[in-house]
C-alpha cells in the first residue's frame, strides 16, 4: 500500500516518522517470529487517523501502536511481551499493543468492533493482503456486549482525568494536556456506544462525529463535547481549553448517567 497517510494531516514528515517506527517494529517482529504471515497495523494509525503532535520541533506519535500478528502457530504471552519490550526500547512510543491470531482461526472471527476495524480499517504492514479474504464479512450492527464495552473500557479514562490536585489551575501545561487527552477518551467512548446502539458504528473518528451531530442533534452538550474531543484527537494541540474543569464535570455526568441507565435496563439514549 503506497502513499498511505497515517494521520489526517497528509504531511510527508509525519508519515516519514511513523514509517521509520513501523520499519523498526516490522524488523523486530520478523526476526523474532519465524512463522509470521502478516503484521497488521490497527487503531487510529491503521485507518489514517493517528494522533500525532509537533512539539518543540519534535514529531511525537501519541498513545500507542496497535498490531495484529497473523501466524501459523500460537504466540505465547512471553514471546509477545518480549517483543513489546524490544520495541519500546527502540521506538519512542508510550505503549505497544499486540494481538496474535492464528491463520486457521481467521475464518472463526466473530462480529466485534475490534474485528470490524481489522477487516475494514487497517493497514497491512507486512505479508500478503489476500489474508483479508480469510476474514468473514463483519456486520456493523454490534451485539449488546459490544455496545456496552466502550462505556467500561473508557471509564478508566474518566477516572485518570480526575483532578488529583483538586484544581486544574495547579497543573502544568503538559499535565493539562494528558488530563484532557483522558477526558476525550471518555467522550469518544460513550459516544461510540450511543452510535452502536442505533446500528451506526463507523471506524472513523471524523465520520462518527458527523453521525453523532446528525443523530443526536437535540443533545447540545453531548454534541459539543464529541466535536471538541474529535477535533483534539485528530488535530492535537498543547493548547487545552481553559474551562477544563467544567468539561470534566459535564462529561462525568454524561458518562455515568449513560452507564447507570444501561444497568437499569432503560433506554440509555
Cite the ranges covered by each PLM segment.
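Active-site nucleotide-donor binding segment shared across nucleotidyl transfer reactions
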Residues: 26-65, 70-75
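N-terminal regions immediately upstream of nucleotidyltransferase
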Residues: 1-34
